[in-house]
Amino acid sequence: MENKHNFMETESITKLLIKFSIPAIVGMFVNALYNVVDRIYIGNIKDIGHLGITGIGVVFPVVILIFSFSLLIGIGSAAAVSLKLGMKDREEAERFLGVAVFLSFIISVVLMLLIYFCMDKIIYFIGGSDKTFIYAKDYLFYINLGVPAAILGLVLNSVIRSDGSPKIAMGTLLLGAITNIVLDPIFIFAFGMGVKGAAIATIISQYISMFWTIYYFTSNKSKIKLIKKNIEFNFYKAKEICLLGSSAFAIQLGFSLVTYILNTVLKKYGGDTSIGAMAIVQSFMTFMAMPIFGINQGIQPILGYNYGAEKYKRVKEALYKGIFAATIICIIGYTSVRLFSSSLIKIFTTNLELEEITRYGLKAYTLVFPIVGFQIVSSIYFQAVGKPKMSFFISLSRQIIVMIPCLIILPIFFGLNGIWYAAPTADSIATLITYILVKKEIKKLDKLEEKLEKRNI
């Protein structure tokens, strides 16, 4: 086991980043297709496409909520496994894997029951109207049946990367996404199921991915094994998993809360069409942000393993190169939106009113997108090295501490335009806060490196 993971200490950081991040980027990029492809197909349903895409936009906070719990357990357990493997403790890593599976099951059951019994109230509470209710409910009912697959599949796939198999993790996401892309037009158009068909295609894809990840950890393919006796509740391990996953959880939970508030203020200042426009804008944001989360998925085991092995110089190098790569991706996304926004929006809708609002909103929402990568990668750094509280604060700084006040205050003075410009305002302030914290952390790493050198003399 030790020999299999020694390359994490000796291989060049650039090669490791490519090995782990490229598959993760491709995987997360493809994973974004789950929601984006649904919206593209639904938006092109004759006569009701604009209402269908608005209905999906209404329930999007719930979809994000489900995803946030999968990240809480997935990123947390992956970080714990990486740290234990860095310490050469395989058995403890396997125990964390078992606890992660147990937590995934319990959380899935609780979420499914809550959503099922409160579905109608939830839809109206998060921005549904009489026009969009039927489409929102059709989608959410079936998506709710896929909660166990959505959570456990992503949790196990996150740990696959920490197990040293990033290509297999990428393949898992590709399997699900390609299945979804193939099934969507069949269920939506061929079977005439519309919005229901999109949701059914999605959950079938998620269950296929989930069963594959279970097979991986019970076969000879994996280095650490999913053992039945380890699938149990352990308070201390559950606490550590949740602490280590709290940053990613906060980002997505905050995103869910922000999306709910967005739906509320959009309904007040712009009506159903504005909610539909935001659904399309968020599709682009998801598509552009997922590669950055892919870098996070890839860099996390590199940071965690080398920090656990006291290779602080390599930790700093990985952080710098991760930030650089994320920034390049952000710049590409920013440029694409400004050059090709009209053509890209037409993929989702041919409704002229919806298209016009979306075009303006997309350019405003992504105004400072090039700086977003720095904050996201910095957050995963603190999480990977076992400092979840700092990571949690960085995540909250953008999603809660700054963004929500902007969404409440700016529309009072600027109406609908204030809603669109809330995101770049929050990103600018949060990035400044993150820069100050990262600068202090780098100084601490320098001191740890000096102590290590003196100890080895």
Model-assigned labels for residue ranges:
Residues 29, 33-53, 123-130, 186-193, ...:
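Helix-terminus/linker motif at the lipid-water interface of multi-pass membrane proteins
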Residues 29-33, 75-77, 108-113, 151, ...:
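Hydrophobic positions within alpha-helical transmembrane segments of bacterial inner-membrane proteins
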Residues 24, 28, 40, 79, ...:
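Transmembrane alpha-helix boundary and packing residues in multipass membrane permease domains
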Residues 1-21, 81-148, 192-245, 303-368, ...:
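Short alpha-helical transmembrane segments in multi-pass integral membrane proteins
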Residues 9-48, 61-76, 80, 105-112, ...:
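N-terminal transmembrane alpha-helices
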Residues 143-161, 169-177, 198-211, 292-297, ...:
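Short runs within selected transmembrane alpha-helices of multi-pass transporters and secretion channels
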Residues 53-113, 150-169, 277-335, 339-341, ...:
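Small-residue-rich hydrophobic transmembrane alpha-helices
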Residues 19-38, 142, 176, 205-209, ...:
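Transmembrane helical elements of multi-pass membrane transporters/channels
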